[in-house]
């Protein structure tokens, strides 16, 4: 027994170095996905294959300078993240190293090799409030809430939970007061042994945190983007994909979601994208505020960034996705609605392809590994609305929004096709729309959402006409795409009057409803009340125009779209200017505004008929 223990303590030795993959020998006694420290600099690595005495380690730092014979230390632990107060308003790399604190220590633009620093600040004092319902000798299981920490003005209740694998009889709980992450908060006794716990705990990133059961999502994820909220809505706890070529606005859509969605926590993972995009978030987010108790509070206080840009080690891209989703699961277990932005899953798949190539695995389509679909599915499967373990009972959700960057905007790319088969909402971005400066460039013909039926009750409670208005707008856009072929062949003049109305109303929908300027004061986001009001006005105008044309046909007095346009030009201008209404206006204001405009359309067309 002693001999085995000594052998386990004996370090392994580097046998071969191939880019980010290191093969080490003398590694008996290790497990899959165990953390290893490679070389004299103690670079962080993870064991991804075991063959006899050899371990294949993917290293999350630059391996230049490693040589055969360097030591490899076995840690006995899996790659884990530290979960506790201080995660929000922070920026990490792919393996949860705090970049801001590292920059202060290094004083350089580059991270030093093998730097070892706690993910959370262990010296910062947090004000802890214990749960008064808990008594000594109570039986405690994983997920039970012991109290909460006042984290910041926007995220006031950071709940302190027992780790999912903890259980026992409560023998100590700290009174209200200021504590650091090093201090003992509660103590459990199980089978004669005592276990102490603090404000934070570790959890392996590859293991999904346990839940009681999954429940059906039935609440709309408000994005503030009209095209998404109206035509392709998604639920809190849903899975969405945003595929698109370069320059289509994927990052802009995911940033808009981070800024204005109705989630309580945002985890933004920049996985292999440009560093400037993360820098843009770091410069934009601190300026964005939201009102809390009549006080402006920075939106960064509900956001955590996991930055793994394209010039960082490729292997860490894979880890960054798992790090992000584990942070999300932690907030979900508190009973909050968390959203994870993965920008972009294509870069993650490319990292899988590179590591798979180094392992000499058989390549499948486009060189990606055969298990690409399974890995994507296991990642997206961690989304959902759930009943959390522990007491008191609570419901939380994780929404995953994954950007996909297919080369050349080709949606038949393996990553895009695998993602399409998994996700329930598909917001396909179109290069042609982007070139016409139509943003967000969501193609209404190729995109879809399977959540509409789940959201029926929600929309009925909000506005009974919503689903019929949504269907009507989809029909008008579909009719326009069918008529476009005729127009290109024989011109607009050959169309009948009602077809001309379809074309003109579809133009209003495209240019004045679906288009949205993310950088303007009036259209950076759109509340649902304004979206529904705009849909109602457009559909009402369309229905009234068709009714007027039909009545004139029966009276044998010809009237065309030209007459309607000339008579109602001021009203049509008002319809096209609806989006300029300030989104900060109250719901009551929007109801009055749209009611007056609806009346104006009805009266205008009635006067035209009476002439």
Curated annotation (Swiss-Prot):
GO cellular component, one term: vacuolar proton-transporting V-type ATPase, V1 domain
InterPro entries listed in its UniProt record: ATP-synt_VA_C, ATP-synth_a_Xtn, ATP_synth_asu-like_sf, ATPase_a/bsu_AS, ATPase_F1/V1/A1_a/bsu_N, ATPase_F1/V1/A1_a/bsu_N_sf, ATPase_F1/V1/A1_a/bsu_nucl-bd, ATPase_F1/V1_b/a_C
Catalytic reactions of this protein: ATP + H2O + 4 H(+)(in) = ADP + phosphate + 5 H(+)(out)
Cell compartments where the protein resides: Cell membrane; Vacuole; Vesicle
Keyword Chaperone: no
PROSITE patterns linked to this entry: ATPASE_ALPHA_BETA
EC number: 7.1.2.2
Description of how activity is regulated: ATP hydrolysis occurs at the interface between the nucleotide-binding domains of subunits A and B. ATP hydrolysis triggers a conformational change in the subunits D and F, which induces a shift of subunit d. The c-ring is subsequently rotated and results in a continuous proton translocation across the membrane.
Pfam families registered for this protein in UniProt: ATP-synt_ab, ATP-synt_ab_N, ATP-synt_ab_Xtn, ATP-synt_VA_C
Keyword Transmembrane helix: no
GO process annotations (BP): ATP metabolic process; proton transmembrane transport; vacuolar acidification
Keywords: ATP-binding, Cell membrane, Hydrogen ion transport, Ion transport, Membrane, Merozoite, Nucleotide-binding, Translocase, Transport, Vacuole
Membrane topology: Peripheral membrane protein
Any one GO molecular-function label of the UniProt entry: ATP binding
The organism's place on the tree of life at top rank: Eukaryota
Binding site for ATP: 244-251
Uses in industry and biotechnology: Possible candidate for an effective malaria vaccine as determined by epitope response in sera.
PANTHER family named in the record: H(+)-TRANSPORTING TWO-SECTOR ATPASE, V-TYPE PROTON ATPASE CATALYTIC SUBUNIT A
Family under the similarity heading: Belongs to the ATPase alpha/beta chains family.
Function: Catalytic subunit of the V1 complex of vacuolar(H+)-ATPase (V-ATPase), a multisubunit enzyme composed of a peripheral complex (V1) that hydrolyzes ATP and a membrane integral complex (V0) that translocates protons. V-ATPase is responsible for acidifying and maintaining the pH of intracellular compartments and in some cell types, is targeted to the plasma membrane, where it is responsible for acidifying the extracellular environment. During the trophozoite stage, involved in the acidification of the extracellular space next to the cell membrane.
Summary of subunit composition and partner proteins: V-ATPase is a heteromultimeric enzyme made up of two complexes: the ATP-hydrolytic V1 complex and the proton translocation V0 complex. The V1 complex consists of three catalytic AB heterodimers that form a heterohexamer, three peripheral stalks each consisting of EG heterodimers, one central rotor including subunits D and F, and the regulatory subunits C and H. The proton translocation complex V0 consists of the proton transport subunit a, a ring of proteolipid subunits c9c'', rotary subunit d and subunit e.
Name under which the protein is recorded: V-type proton ATPase catalytic subunit A
Originating species: Plasmodium falciparum (isolate 3D7)
Gene: vapA
